[in-house]
Amino acid sequence: MNHFPKLLSSQIGFDVAQTILENFDRHYRIFREAAVEAKDLFERADWHGLQRLARERITSYDDRVRECVELLEDEYDAENIDNEVWPQIKLHYIGLLTSHRQPECAETFFNSVCCKILHRAYFNNDFIFVRPAISTEYIENDEPAAKPTYRAYYPGSEGLAATLERIVTNFQLNPPFEDLERDIACIMQAIHDEFGAFDEAVNFQIHVLSSLFYRNKTAYVVGRIINGDRVLPFAVPIRHARAGILALDTVLLRRDQLKIIFSFSHSYFLVDMNVPSAYVQFLRSIMPGKPKAEIYTSVGLQKQGKNLFYRDLLHHLSHSSDRFIVAPGIKGLVMLVFTLPSFPYVFKMIKDHFPPPKDTTREQIMAKYLLVKRHDRLGRMADTLEYSSVALPLARLDDALVRELEKEVPSLIEYEGENLVIKHLYIERRMVPLNLYLQNGSDAEIEHGVREYGNAVKELMQANIFPGDMLYKNFGVTRHGRVVFYDYDEIEYLTDCNVRRVPPPRNDEDEMSGEPWYTVGPHDIFPETYAPFLLGDPRVREHFLAHHADFFDPQLWQDSKDRLLRGELPDFFAYEPALRFCIRYPERFAPGDAADGGKLAAA
């Protein structure tokens, strides 16, 4: 039976709610300013500046939460606010959000602040937003000068080519295009190649999100074509063809291609969104089946994505009955990994003790994971969600897993009634371990896996990442067939490594020895020594040497390091370079146009 609610009588309750919302609004203003700055940096081709901006934005949320907590403690002695007041704070906050344009993100910010203040009381659902209180349906910015979430274009009156040109020019990028008419013709040809000639239905139209999506050296136009009952997604990457000159690089017309550029293995986009829920709804319409949590994360709202993921997990637990088990495969020396078979993620915990030869600490491993979070992942390193105080029902934990937890991570678990509380863990997308993929694959799959592995490591080294442990078991194969690195405890910056050749043996005894006859420093790497570990399977060896014979040559690694030390940033593509217009339709490009490209890498 529900009781008549008490009056909201606490002035402190209202003041605290208003203070939290003011701090969220400041956070989101800074978030949007970063996207505006990204446009300027892109136009000026300031790639180092874009990298810096992306790193700073990742840490911005935690900085704003910390500032808000400090303010509440100074102004209201927040830790000692009476428990009867906190529900009033929440209700006042809900009232303040009724016409807000980012209510879901503001609720998550409220939870983050409360977690810092209330500590274990976080589990009191009356104090926080376990479920959303404010609907995000049909939110739109109706201010006169505001951009709509997306713009609708109707090609029937002016023709498709003219409409596509207007779509591009409406973004008002400062640098001129090398040959926009040529690029539009390439888009028209690509659409014809993909779909053939199609009749224009009475509702034929194109919807384009009003803001560009910035990442690495690319700005993406994202939209959908509506024709009859068909919804056709598309993305058009805009790049610098040369200094101060832009070009449309390709058009991506398949959902799988869009899912890859928005995948968990890429860094977050910088995109200006006044109503983020409307952007997410649009993106889900062109990538159905992609979780909202992943989309929020990919557009830079990783805390909102993390919040939604946890809700998805709780929802899944309430609608499933299988048990968490130790993850199959080779056990790691540093991490304990478990999974729920019906849920496509793995849960990773840092062990309390590491056997030799591992020489590291929990703090060092956490620093490695933070490094990856802030680094440009290029589609080759899995993103991780980091959680504290996660309560899992004991009844859903396999007995063997409980024994493993008690043995390997006793400092990280606590029993609370019918729950096991995990103090700290990482969560990643579940992938097929590359060693199992190669072990069980057909000849074509082995060739694909080996080619992808070599490409992944080469792209990582160009991005200043040395994986450390090169074994296949530390890499996974995604649903889209891409090889991604996911074991970070030995990761280093390539520029911190000393690339060395193996010195020749001094005598026969050296040559027969199983131990190195030369000194090895802590940051020395010897690419020649990787071959015995990677080429043991004759089938793998054949394809590896066919595609990546240079992999074991120290000069390849040294050249990448030298370019990094000179401040060079190579070109990476979140799609196959073969899709680029300059490669796909070379007859349309004059010598010296965007096709000069230089060294390419698919990321």
From Swiss-Prot:
GO biological process: glucose metabolic process; glyoxylate cycle; tricarboxylic acid cycle
GO cellular component: cytoplasm
Location relative to the cell: Cytoplasm
Catalytic activity, reaction form: L-seryl-[isocitrate dehydrogenase] + ATP = O-phospho-L-seryl-[isocitrate dehydrogenase] + ADP + H(+)
Binding site for ATP: 327-333, 348
EC number: 2.7.11.5, 3.1.3.-
Taxonomy, superkingdom: Bacteria
Record's keyword terms, sorted: ATP-binding, Cytoplasm, Glyoxylate bypass, Hydrolase, Kinase, Nucleotide-binding, Protein phosphatase, Serine/threonine-protein kinase, Transferase, Tricarboxylic acid cycle
Active site: 383
GO MF, one example: protein serine/threonine kinase activity
Protein task: Bifunctional enzyme which can phosphorylate or dephosphorylate isocitrate dehydrogenase (IDH) on a specific serine residue. This is a regulatory mechanism which enables bacteria to bypass the Krebs cycle via the glyoxylate shunt in response to the source of carbon. When bacteria are grown on glucose, IDH is fully active and unphosphorylated, but when grown on acetate or ethanol, the activity of IDH declines drastically concomitant with its phosphorylation.
HAMAP family registered for this protein in UniProt: AceK
Family: Belongs to the AceK family.
Designated name of the protein: Isocitrate dehydrogenase kinase/phosphatase
Taxonomic classification: Bacteria, Pseudomonadati, Pseudomonadota, Betaproteobacteria, Burkholderiales
